[in-house]
C-alpha cells in the first residue's frame, strides 16, 4: 500500500530511504531508518518503511513485525491494517491475515486498493468465494483498473467459472490488445470450455508471437490435440510457489491426500531398522519426511519450487535439498547411491516415464526400492494421458509395469487406490508402485537414457 504523501524534510528523508531500498542499498537504508525511528518513534510511515526494508532483505518475519508496529501506532488506518494482512498471508498465517483483511475492508469499504488486497489474501487462504466478492466490489468501484480485472478473472478461473472468466479476460484484451496474460488465459479458458477451434486460433496467435516460449509451445501442442511429453518447468514452479503456504492443509485436509503417510508405512515395513538413505523426488513441503520421522541415514529432498523447499526445511528432518527439476536430478545423480527413491504426486506433472524409471533403477543400490504414485488411466486409454480438466498426466498401470520390468526391476507391486485424492468433490483413482532392484543386477541390464 502507498504511504501518505507530504513535502516536509522528514518525508523527503523517508523517500530517500525508500529509493535506497528499491536500489538494494539495504545497509545505508537500515541505518537511516534506525535514525528516523529515533527521531519520530510514533510516525507510522517509519514502521511501513520497515516493512519494505524487511521484504527486500527476505526477512518475512521482520516484515510482519514491522507491520504489527504500524497497526499498533495507527490501529484505525486502513493502509497499516491492510499491510499487516498481506504480510501475514505471505507467512502463511492465513487465519489472522483474514481477520485483518476483514477489518481493513470494514475501515475502507469503498477503497478499491483495500478490497483488491483483501481479495488476494482470501485467495491465498483458499477462500475463493470471499475473494470473488471483494474483487467484484473493487471492480465495481474501479472498472478501468485492468490489473484488478485480470486478477478477478483469474479468481473466477480458479473457481472453475470458466465462461465468466473468459468474459473478463476478453474485456481486458479489448482494453489492452497486447495483454499477453489475458491472451494466454483465454486459451486455457477455451480448452476448459471445449472450444477447440478457438483454442487453436489463440494458440496459433501466441506461437507466432512467442515461438521459443516453452509454455506457449506446450499449450499450442495441447490445443492441437497432441500430448506433450512433460509440462514446462515455469508452469510447475509457478503453481507450487503460489501453493506452498497452504499446501499441507489443502492437500491433506481438503483433498484427503494420504500417499505420503501410506508410503512411509510401506518403507518402515520394508526397512524397520530405519537404516537407509532416501532421495525424495518432488518432495514438496516434506510430508513424507513428517511421516517417516528420523532415519539412520539421509533424507534428500528435490523440488523445483524454492518456496516448497522452504516449507519442507522447517520440519528439520531432511538432510539437504536440491532446487532442480526431477529429470535433472535423476540424470545427474551417481549410480548405486540410494536404498530408496520416492516420487509422490509429482509424475502427474512429469508425464513421460522413459527418462524416469531407468535412471531410478541406475541410482538405486542392489535391493533398493523405487516407490512412486500415479493418477490412473484406464486400460482402454493410451499409456500416457493428459487430463484436460486438471492439466495433469495419468498413467496406465500395465504400461508402468512394463517400463519397470524393461528397466530391470524384478519385483513390481501395485497398491491400487480408489482415491489417490479428492478432485472437485470426487475420488480420483490412482496407484502406488513399489519396484525393487534385484540383489544382483544382470550384466546385460538396459542402460538409462
Segments and roles (model prediction):
Residues 10, 44-45, 78-79, 112-113, ...:
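Helix-start (N-cap) detector for alpha-helical repeat units in TPR-like alpha-solenoids
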Residues 22-23, 56, 90-91, 124-125, ...:
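Register position in tetratricopeptide repeats
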Residues 49, 83, 117, 151, ...:
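Canonical tetratricopeptide repeat
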Residues 279, 285-330:
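Class I SAM-dependent methyltransferase SAM/SAH-binding core
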Residues 331-341:
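A short acidic, Gly/Pro-enriched loop at the edge of an enzyme's catalytic core
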Residues 354-366:
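A short glycine-rich, Lys/Arg-flanked "PGG" loop and its adjoining helix->strand segment in the class I
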Residues 372-392:
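Short, glycine-/aromatic-enriched active-site segment of Class I SAM-dependent methyltransferases
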Amino acid at each position: 500500500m502507498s504511504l501518505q504523501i507530504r513535502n516536509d524534510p522528514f518525508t523527503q528523508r523517508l523517500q530517500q530511504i525508500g529509493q535506497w531500498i528499491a536500489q538494494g542499498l539495504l545497509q545505508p537504508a537500515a541505518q537511516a531508518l534506525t535514525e528516523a525511528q529515533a527521531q519520530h518513534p510514533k510516525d507510522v510511515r517509519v514502521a511501513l518503511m520497515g516493512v519494505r526494508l524487511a521484504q527486500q532483505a527476505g526477512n518475512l518475519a521482520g516484515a510482519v513485525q514491522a507491520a504489527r508496529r504500524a497497526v499498533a501506532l495507527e490501529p484505525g488506518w486502513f493502509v497499516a491494517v491492510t499491510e499487516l494482512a498481506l504480510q501475514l498471508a505471505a507467512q502463511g498465517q492465513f487465519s489472522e491475515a483474514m481477520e485483518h483483511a476483514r477489518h481493513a475492508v470494514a475501515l475502507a469499504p469503498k477503497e478499491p486498493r483495500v478490497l483488491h488486497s483483501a481479495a488476494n489474501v482470501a485467495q491465498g487462504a483458499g477462500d475463493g468465494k470471499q475473494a470473488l466478492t471483494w474483487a467484484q466490489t473493487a471492480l465495481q468501484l474501479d472498472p478501468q483498473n485492468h490489473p484488478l480485472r485480470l486478477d478477478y478473472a483469474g479468481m473466477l478461473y480458479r473457481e472453475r467459472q470458466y465462461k465468466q472468466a473468459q468474459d473478463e479476460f476478453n474485456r481486458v484484451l479489448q482494453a489492452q490488445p497486447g495483454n499477453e496474460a489475458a491472451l494466454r488465459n483465454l486459451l486455457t479458458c477455451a480448452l476448459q470450455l471445449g472450444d477447440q477451434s478457438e483454442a487453436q486460433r489463440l494458440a496459433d496467435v501466441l506461437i507466432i508471437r512467442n515461438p521459443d516460449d516453452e509454455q506457449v509451445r506446450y499449450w499450442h501442442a495441447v490445443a492441437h490435440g497432441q500430448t506433450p511429453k512433460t509440462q514446462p518447468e515455469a508452469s510447475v514452479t509457478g503453481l507450487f510457489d503460489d501453493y506452498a503456504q497452504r499446501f499441507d492443509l489443502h492437500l491433506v485436509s481438503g483433498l484427503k491426500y494420504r500417499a505420503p503417510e501410506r508410503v512411509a508405512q510401506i518403507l518402515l515395513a520394508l526397512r524397520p531398522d530405519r537404516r537407509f538413505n532416501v532421495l525424495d523426488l518432488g518432495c514438496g513441503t516434506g510430508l513424507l519426511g513428517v511421516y517417516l520421522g528420523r532415519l539412520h541415514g539421509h533424507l534428500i529432498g528435490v523440488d523445483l519450487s524454492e518456496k516448497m523447499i522452504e516449507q519442507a526445511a522447517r520440519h528439520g528432518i531432511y538432510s539437504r535439498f536440491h532446487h532442480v527439476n526431477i529429470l535433472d536430478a535423476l540424470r545427474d545423480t551417481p549410480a548405486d547411491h540410494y536404498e530408496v527413491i520416492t516420487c509422490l504426486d509429482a509424475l502427474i506433472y512429469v508425464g513421460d516415464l522413459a527418462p524416469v524409471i531407468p535412471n531410478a533403477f541406475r541410482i538405486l543400490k542392489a535391493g533398493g526400492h523405487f516407490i512412486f504414485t500415479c493418477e490412473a488411466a484406464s486400460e482402454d486409454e493410451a499409456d500416457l494421458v493428459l487430463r484436460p480438466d486438471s492439466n495433469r498426466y495419468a498413467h496406465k498401470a500395465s504400461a508402468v509395469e512394463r517400463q519397470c520390468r524393461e528397466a530391470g526391476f524384478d519385483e513390481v507391486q501395485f497398491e491400487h487406490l480408489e482415491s489417490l485424492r479428492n478432485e472437485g468433490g470426487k475420488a480420483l483413482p490412482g496407484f502406488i508402485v513399489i519396484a525393487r532392484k534385484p540383489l544382483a543386477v544382470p550384466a546385460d541390464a538396459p542402460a538409462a537414457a
